[in-house]
Amino acid sequence: MASLRLFTCLTYFTQVAFPGGNAQISSAQLIDIIPKREVLYVGGRYTNITASLDSHSFYIYVEKLSPNPAPANPPLPIIFIAGAAQTGTNFLSTPDRRPGWASYFISKGHTVYLSDQPARGRSFWFPGQGNIGYIGPPDSVSDIFTDVAHNGNQWPQAKLHTQWPGTGRIGDPTFDAFYRSQMQFQTDRFISEEQNAQAYSALVDLVGSCYIISHSQAGAYGWRVGDMRSDLVKGIIQLEPSGPPFTLRPPFGNDPAFAFGLTDLAIQYEPSAGKNAENIETIIEPAIDADHNECIMQKDPAKQLTNLGKIPELVVTGEASFHAPYDYCTVKYLEQAGVDVEYADLGKEGIHGNGHMFFMEKNNLEIADRVYQWLKKH
């Protein structure tokens, strides 16, 4: 019974003021409660897998976690979309068993929806659909995510990483717990983007007006859903989103990608980008300094994102992450295309030492509060 309680309980935060800087929340400010919990399977379709076999595929497993008791005037619910090889557990708690972002936002009255992408975790995958891969060997995961300061300076800001709990290497219990949480995932970007766009649009239809918080690989999916449901998505928070526009960047190479700027598949521009983005013309803008990448932008006059332009956005970047050299390009591109976007470059705001997984690092609640302050205005 005790283990079941540990599994189902979330730590609920009392309403506390977060001062600026590196303020932390103490355990004395926490009380244990059990939020209202529902499990859903959303989206997907019946598909002919073989000549003699039908199946229902491409849906997502979803946990709905609501404040209990419900507040009288609740804020809009939040849909979380995790990044590559991750699941909804990213936001449930941290690998060293501290409260995650779900607990924080429930404490503020939000209902949260945690989910596993199609073909991942508790969401069905049938062998033969696309290409299924895995996160990579432990040392690579350490170098990119958890022990960035000792990765041989793979990007200029890497040495600034201080916020991961523990050593970030094999044998450290926090790293081992994090690595065990990694899941198989669809590596075909086009299949994955379309399946996620359809599944999460179905979830938005079910939820109604909401915010989306998407991380990393799921950045493109958050944008696709916003483009498809611009009447219901009231704000998009991008945690180091996929990108930058039109290209990959190290540590994942420099190949062309994201033909529609933010996505691989079509989103709405005015004038039209064309069926295959053939009408988008680009230029290269020099990097702002030696620690940042150059940006690929549209030629003027820039086409405007007609649907995404209706939705305010917040982009959040960790000081030491591999996104630090280029997320500013994504923000510039959004601005150029007519999106109302705010950039939380955490290091410049006095929140230091974070890598790509900042929502589970030592100061995760301070960053959650930064997001919450934005939500309160939107």
Residue ranges and their predicted role:
Residues 349-378:
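Catalytic active-site module of serine/aspartate enzymes centered on a nucleophile-bearing elbow/loop
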Residues 73-83:
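Short beta-strand element of the alpha/beta-hydrolase
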Residues 213-222:
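Gly/Ala-rich beta-loop-alpha elbow adjacent to hydrolase catalytic centers
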Residues 70, 163-165, 169-176, 180-184, ...:
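Conserved acidic catalytic loop of the alpha/beta-hydrolase fold
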Residues 1-23:
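Fungal secretory targeting signals
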Residues 25-72:
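N-terminal cap/lid segment of alpha/beta-hydrolase-fold proteins
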Residues 309, 315-317:
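Short beta-strand/loop motif that positions the catalytic acidic residue
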Residues 84-108, 113, 121-122, 245-246, ...:
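Short substrate-entry loop that stabilizes the transition state in hydrolases
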